[in-house]
Regions:
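N-terminal Rossmann-like FAD-binding beta1-loop-alpha1 element of flavoenzymes
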Residues: 2-29
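Conserved Rossmann-like nucleotide-cofactor binding loop
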Residues: 11, 35, 258
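Short loop/edge segments at beta-strand edges and connector loops
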Residues: 80-82, 222-226, 376
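Dinucleotide-binding Rossmann-like beta1-alpha1 core, especially the glycine-rich loop
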Residues: 46-124
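Mid-domain catalytic core of redox enzymes
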Residues: 22, 229-346, 362-366
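Conserved flavin/dinucleotide-binding core of flavoenzymes
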Residues: 42, 97-98, 312-407
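Glycine-rich FAD pyrophosphate-binding loop
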Residues: 20-45
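Active-site/ligand-binding neighborhood in enzyme catalytic cores
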Residues: 110-236, 254
Length: 407
């Protein structure tokens, strides 16, 4: 066959459907789970959809992506929301991002935050440090660092924050003392607004419905319950746990590289580097109570709470109740046992460790030369949202067809 696609999440489904739209049908998708959607799957819990992968929404910012996705699930089946997300920090509830909304805090806290921002390293000309924790202090000031960024990132990723690089944060604008002061005086937000400032969510379903429909559009081209165990680069062959072998001219892998128990034909140094790719696992847990808030989600940096974020389901999922939490797998021991619905996502977030860019550049370049292309959050080991992943998959199909190799 021309294309073997590993994984029926947003990346794999988009790539496959885009091929079909281009008139190419010589492909197959293999998926470990019994349903499509990857991290964006939904299940029914307490009478309404529960997104087992956590908070996944369709950002409005990519019209080309939305047009493509609406061809499977029309726009009239979606609600459009203005993002309402807050951070609970030191008894204050402030809008996200924190640096633009310090004006919402108690006056005494505003003063302390302003003082720390004024002497942040980036504002007084101190050289930029390399260590992650030092960089956070340098970029945001001690108050934002100690009250929010450091404890939150420890909860979301792990305690060893200095294993992370700073390359993924360097595009963040400096926190301007002048803008923050004006914000506090005028009582309104300044600065750049976060991603998902507006987003879509299905009216009648969970986010997973979109991917189910995309899978239905290529029915007969997906094999489920197929867990990949090995790959042979010499023959471009994939081996699954049941012993079946699949061979293709080009393999598109959207699954974690760590999932290959056996890798044949890859240089030892590249193969060895895969073990240095890190990730965090996240458990989602459902609670049936309605919260007295209009927010869509809430961030909790407090280290005494096990979870780092709450998704308030009844505020974005029509005719639902309750909320769910997101908790790093290393912290679930803090929770009291209960009978709530829970789901553990082994592969939730790729970690942006210091050496990751070097590892992935070499890995992806070499493997592409062998006809195996990494795509999406796990194929590229990048913390992409679903809309970005869809965009990348669409572009990859265009690139491969334009190259003339796959007419």
């Amino acid at each position: 066959m021309k294309f073997l696609i590993l994984g029926a999440g947003p990346a794999g489904l988009t790539f496959a459907n885009k091929l079909k739209q281009k008139g190419i049908t010589d492909f197959l998708v293999i998926e470990r789970e019994e349903t499509a959607g990857g991290l964006c799957r939904s299940v029914d819990v307490d009478g309404s959809p529960f997104d087992i992968g956590g908070g996944h929404f369709l950002d409005v910012r990519r019209p080309k992506v939305n047009e493509f996705l609406f061809s499977f699930m029309p726009e009239e089946e979606w609600n459009k929301y203005d993002r309402d997300s807050v951070i609970v920090v030191n008894g204050n509830t402030v809008s996200h991002p924190i640096e633009a909304n310090i004006w919402q805090m108690k006056i005494s806290d505003q003063v302390e935050y302003l003082k720390s921002i004024a002497v942040a390293g980036c504002n007084i000309g101190t050289p930029m440090p390399e260590a992650f924790v030092d960089w956070i202090y340098w970029k945001l000031g001690s108050k934002i660092a100690e009250d929010y960024m450091i404890p939150y990132n420890r909860k979301m990723f792990n305690n060893e924050l200095n294993q992370l690089g700073t390359y993924w944060l360097e595009k963040l604008p400096n926190v301007s003392f002048e803008e923050t002061l004006l914000s506090c005086l005028e009582k309104k937000a300044y600065g750049t607004q976060p991603g998902h400032a507006q987003f879509y969510y299905p009216k009648k379903y969970g986010y997973g419905e979109l991917w189910i429909r995309m899978a239905d559009a290529i029915k007969g081209k997906i094999e489920y319950n197929k867990s990949v165990k090995g790959i042979d680069f010499n023959t471009k062959t994939v081996i699954t746990a049941d012993g079946k072998k699949y061979q293709a001219e080009t393999i598109i892998t959207t699954i974690p590289w760590m999932e290959f128990d056996e890798i044949i034909g890859m240089p030892e140094d590249i193969k060895d580097s895969i073990k240095y790719l890190k990730f965090s696992s996240i458990q989602t847990e459902y609670f049936s109570e309605n919260l007295d808030t209009s927010c869509h989600w809430i961030y909790y940096p407090d280290p005494m709470l096990s979870y780092h974020r709450i998704l308030v389901r009844h505020n974005f999922c029509t005719n639902s109740k309750g909320y769910w939490t997101e908790t790093n797998s290393e912290r679930i021991g803090m929770e009291k046992p209960n009978d709530n619905f829970k789901y553990m996502n082994q592969y939730a977030y790729p970690l942006n460790t210091i050496k990751k860019p070097e590892i992935m550049k070499k890995l992806l370049s070499w493997s592409e030369g062998k006809g195996v292309i990494g795509l999406g959050r796990w194929g590229e080991h990048q913390h992409y949202n679903s809309d970005v992943t869809v965009d990348l998959a669409m572009e990859l199909v265009e690139k491969l067809i334009t190259s003339g190799t796959y007419d």
